[in-house]
Amino acid sequence: MHIVADENIPLLDEFFAAFGSIRRLPGRGISAADVRDADLLLVRSVTQVNRALLEGSRVRFVGTCTIGTDHLDLDYFAEAGIAWSSAPGCNARGVVDYVLGSVLTLAEREGVDPAARVYGVVGAGQVGGRLVHLLRGLGWQVRVCDPPRQAAEGGDFVSLERIIEECDVISLHTPLDASTRHLFDATRLAALQPGAWLINASRGAVVDNAALRTLLPQRPDLKVVLDVWEGEPQADVELAALCQLATPHIAGYSLDGKLRGTAQIYQACCRVLGLPEQVSLDELLPAPWLSEMSIDSSADPAWVLASLCRAVYDPRRDDADFRRSLVGDADARRAAFDRLRKHYPMRREIDGLRVRIQGDAPQLAALVRALGAATT
């Protein structure tokens, strides 16, 4: 078999070399000519996989190492009999770490207690649902908006209008489709509560970037964190300058999440081809640089929360790197956006951390477990 794959997918040889030859290409540049003789196509979100790319090719399986599928033409896949798989939940923990790290950074800058805010999570799928679980585990107030889940399950969901009216912090985790494009348009952005924080780590076009750029100079009370941008890899330089944190679509870029994504499409490919799985992620995932921390039972819980989160991930570094890249002409900035993603430094997830508490401190132990770390 012949495999065409995005060059930035990790562990391609380890998982797929036994299937056949692998041709690695830049994801944004994969063309119809490249895939004409391919049997398997492995991509990330930067590759639009549709009729124009695949018609006339031999491709019988498409795997994307991402949660989202808005870059895949699933209707065409069904018509053409092409099997496919995404990697649901692969980077959910990494995105949650990003959101929590961003909240703690804003709280420190603004001099507020993050536990005193009311959180609104828009979209409660793999990522948003995990974020809701963590925030509630910390004992923080959370409202959740997810119309599809509300229609299917009923339960404790609220409208988007209530999120905007009642929440100080709004974190967006919706897929991108016709119903969510510019979900936060000029009207909804203007309706945000005084001093609200808006975090978008889903898809850039869920927020109207032009409307947000126009609004922020008039509403300096609003604090915005953007990891995703309309028109990627071209980010809006003026908008980035108005954000408290700005990063190049790396919220879910933990090493664990990347490798998990490759493993999930490998498993799906084995199922489609009727082949046994011969490789396990557990045997390929390296030990983390930091695996254990020790704290005293007298430690302040707020300090413990910030220290554990930042020991694993601190978004301020990515923000600084991204801002330094926003120079030169448009071509240079686009290249820098992709370069930051391609050469992203190793980052692990907080649930791989073990925390040793010296003494009896049930409150601290509960906090550590709510974060997803283990106590010893």
From Swiss-Prot:
GO terms for cellular component: cytosol. Substrate binds at residues 45, 66, 253. PROSITE patterns: D_2_HYDROXYACID_DH_2, D_2_HYDROXYACID_DH_3. Gene3D superfamilies: 3.30.1370.170, NAD(P)-binding Rossmann-like Domain (3.40.50.720). The active site is at residues 203, 232, 249. Pfam families: 2-Hacid_dh, 2-Hacid_dh_C, DUF3410. Its main location: cytoplasm. It catalyses: 4-phospho-D-erythronate + NAD(+) = (R)-3-hydroxy-2-oxo-4-phosphooxybutanoate + NADH + H(+). Keywords: Cytoplasm, NAD, Oxidoreductase, Pyridoxine biosynthesis. NAD(+) binds at residues 126-127, 146, 174, 201-203, 227, 252. It comes from the Bacteria. Its EC number is 1.1.1.290. GO terms for molecular function: 4-phosphoerythronate dehydrogenase activity; NAD binding; protein dimerization activity. The keyword Lipid metabolism does not apply. Catalyzes the oxidation of erythronate-4-phosphate to 3-hydroxy-2-oxo-4-phosphonooxybutanoate. Homodimer. Belongs to the D-isomer specific 2-hydroxyacid dehydrogenase family. PdxB subfamily. This is Erythronate-4-phosphate dehydrogenase. It comes from Ectopseudomonas mendocina (strain ymp). The gene is pdxB.
